[in-house]
Amino acid sequence: MDVQQIKTILDAHGSWLRNEVGGVRADLRDADLRGADLRDADLRGANLQGANLQCANLQGADLRGADLQGANLRGADLRGADLQGANLRGADLQGADLRDADLDFSAWPLWCGSQDAIVDARIASQLAAHFCVLVCDDPAYQAARKALLPFACTSHRAEDLGLVEI
């Protein structure tokens, strides 16, 4: 997809977000966006299912509520991106840089596709907090939870999740 096509789609999407006549939600399903410069793009609610965003620059992009199911985000720069409520199921985040990204209420892929993702302490503590609220009576889990709990309690979501250090 060339730069002009992307610009046209983003302009129509912006109109859609503002409820303007002629606005159309961005449909970038299966689009080849490898290496695309989408810094600070407003892609709220966009359909990016199966899109190839390998090595794309999405730094500071607004992807709230975007559907990135099955997207290839290998090596993508997502630093400072807002991914609140984004669907990342089946997305490949290997080598993606998510430092300073906001992943609140998003679907983080719990499979090998999220291995090697680069995160900051905020995201790591949030993942740890979600791990620590699981209910499991296995002694190995209990030991891991006990070791992880102090770090998990530093999460900005710890209080919402009812986490307290024991």
Where are these regions (language model features)?
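Intrinsic low-complexity/IDR segments
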Residues: M1-R34, Q49, Q59, Q84, ...
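Catalytic phosphate/metal-binding cores of nucleic-acid and nucleotide-processing enzymes, i.e., regions
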Residues: R64, R74, R79, R89
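Acyl-group handoff/entry surfaces in thioester-processing enzymes
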Residues: G45
